[in-house]
Design a protein with these regions (language model features):
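Acidic catalytic loop of the alpha/beta-hydrolase fold
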Residues: 241-245, 275
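Serine-hydrolase catalytic machinery in alpha/beta-hydrolase-like enzymes
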Residues: 75-76, 88-169, 280-281, 286-300
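N-terminal cap/lid segment of alpha/beta-hydrolase-fold proteins
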Residues: 53-86
Length: 324
């Protein structure tokens, strides 16, 4: 009886919170609310399962190439979405942005990620969403200056290769047919995962078949020494008006790579800001210290035309390099 009352109270809190929640990019609060994470934790529900479309992710764990506080390999959290199939599947590793995999507003996997997972599942690919933050005790880094962040690009690269090794070891995944896709900070990780000069690539002994970087920050990669060198197909999708992760460093990187005949493609969507694939209207975030406008903030939000064009290009790209 007591447990029933507790669960009833949790349910009331959860559904009340849902009514107050507004799904915005980057986990920014527009109203005070009680997180739905408590309800999920008590009910034992994987945070992606409440999303529409019948998607039921398997919660998995696997080692990163990074070390944990104990000195051993850091164990990562992941959410594996798989279409029904009796045959092994190609797969795509997905990397979240600076707000993490789980929305602070809903307690669920952010809709941009589940929407992309659904698109890729419909193509016949398994999708592994990697949570790089929760295992490190970090909720978000959007509001943290670049120099002060505890999680940097090198951590995302090591997580990427941990995920790649994990998927290649599974009998239900086609080894060697694993791609990557990332958004914003995770887009930088996906981009860097294709860099043949990184330590993680050399240590892993494995390759991603192809990668998509959605509105990544390319500044560090465009300046690094030794120079970024793509070992496989890389597609960068960017917004023309992005003032959080501007397109010009990505253009520099792409042109330089193409001059070396490396398979790097850059697509720039006119009029699009950061996170153009979201469903939220464009608004200004003034709590972000890393954009090009200083204290004036950055623009984030949907551009429906760019979103649909990007989805189409992602389908074409992975069909070409992963099959199906």
């Amino acid at each position: 009886m007591m447990m029933t009352k507790i669960l009833q109270k949790v349910a009331n809190i959860w559904f009340g919170a849902r009514n107050l929640a507004i799904d915005v990019v980057g986990g920014m609060h527009t109203q005070m609310m009680v997180s739905g994470a408590l309800a999920f934790a008590l009910a034992g529900v994987v945070p992606g399962t409440a999303h529409g479309g019948g998607m039921q992710p398997e919660q998995v764990s696997f080692p990163s190439l990074d070390k944990g506080k104990s000195g051993g390999a850091l164990t990562l959290d992941g959410y594996l979405f798989k279409p029904d199939s009796r045959e092994p599947l190609p797969a795509v590793v997905m990397f979240h942005g600076c707000a993490g995999a789980i929305s602070v507003n809903t307690g669920r996997i952010t809709s941009r990620f589940t929407n992309m997972a659904q698109l890729l599942n419909d193509m016949g690919y398994a999708v592994l969403i990697v949570d790089s933050f929760n295992p490190r005790g970090v909720k978000q880094i959007c509001t943290v200056p670049l120099a002060d962040r505890d999680i940097k690009n090198r951590h995302r690269i090591m997580d990427a290769y941990g995920a790649l090794q994990y998927l290649n070891s599974r009998p239900d995944i086609v080894a060697g047919k694993v791609g990557a896709i990332g958004f914003s900070h995770g887009g930088s990780g996906a981009l860097s995962a294709m860099d043949a000069t990184t330590d993680a690539y050399g240590r892993s002994g494995q390759k991603f078949a192809a990668a998509v970087a959605m509105y990544p920050g390319c500044g560090w990669q465009s300046r690094k020494q030794p120079e970024f060198s793509a070992y496989g197909p890389l597609l960068i999708l960017a917004g023309e008006k992005d003032d959080w992760t501007p397109v010009e460093p990505c253009r520099t990187l792409a042109v330089r790579s193409q001059q070396r005949n490396e398979p790097v493609e850059l697509v720039v969507y006119p009029g699009a800001y950061h996170a153009f694939d979201s469903v939220s209207e464009v608004y200004v975030r003034k709590d972000v210290p890393n954009g090009v406008n200083g204290t004036a903030g950055v623009h984030v939000g949907a551009n429906p035309a760019a979103r649909e064009a990007a989805y189409k290009r992602v389908r074409e790209f992975f069909h070409e390099h992963l099959g199906r």
